[in-house]
Regions:
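Charged regulatory segments coupled to nucleotide-binding catalytic modules in large multidomain enzymes
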Residues: 73, 84-185
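Glycine/threonine-rich ATP-lid/beta-loop region of ATP-binding domains
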Residues: 1-97, 101-105
Length: 187
């Protein structure tokens, strides 16, 4: 059940203008709603969908991600990633969703890069990542596994290295920056 629920969440995060509803039939015959939402549309759809699924607190802990990773042809990485501030990440990498042109994608290499770069800024946590890699349809092959979630990307190594560089650039302004609480008067 958990695997199916996670898969539905992955689709609900990336789709636009779709009504999602799923429930679980308990042994006593009672139904419990697990996922009820209408996916948003527009430029902030991923963050809005994230807020609907995981709550506004989770949505407030992320920043937009829009990286131009073009090498020979146009390519972008769009979505959201946790702000590299202590306390805004997660204790595990359970909220990392990757897509290739809107198709859910099991990409452990991209997850590893996101985790590695993020942990240079926040060493104790993992980022929430919802990232859609947008490349030309002739730059990847979906016929790798029956579930179509394992994809072969042409020039994958160069694209991933470019993503690493741009993620480091994105986070670098926050290097060495710490959140400070309001000063309190000692009595």
């Amino acid at each position: 059940y958990n695997k199916a629920h996670t898969m539905l969440q992955a689709y609900a995060l990336i789709t636009q203008n779709v009504r999602w509803s799923s429930c679980v039939q308990l042994e006593n015959g009672r139904q419990v709603s697990q996922l009820v939402m209408r996916s948003a549309s527009g430029p902030n759809a991923i963050q809005t969908n994230m807020s609907a699924l995981f709550g506004t607190k989770a949505s407030a802990a992320v920043q937009p991600l829009d990286l131009d990773i073009s090498l020979d042809e146009p390519a972008r990485l769009q979505g959201v990633i946790s702000k590299p501030t202590m306390g805004l990440g997660r204790s595990s990498g359970d909220r990392q969703y990757f897509y290739l042109n809107g198709r859910p994608w099991d990409c452990t290499k991209l997850a590893h890069i996101c985790n590695q770069v993020y942990r240079t800024f926040n060493a104790t946590q993992y980022p929430t990542v919802i990232a859609n890699l947008i490349i030309g349809p002739d730059k990847y092959d979906v016929n790798v596994s029956p579930d179509k979630r394992t994809l072969y990307v042409h020039d994958e190594t160069a694209l991933l290295e470019r993503i690493r560089e741009l993620l480091e650039d994105t986070f670098s302004p926050s290097r060495g920056v710490f959140a400070v609480d309001e000063p309190k008067k000692l009595s």
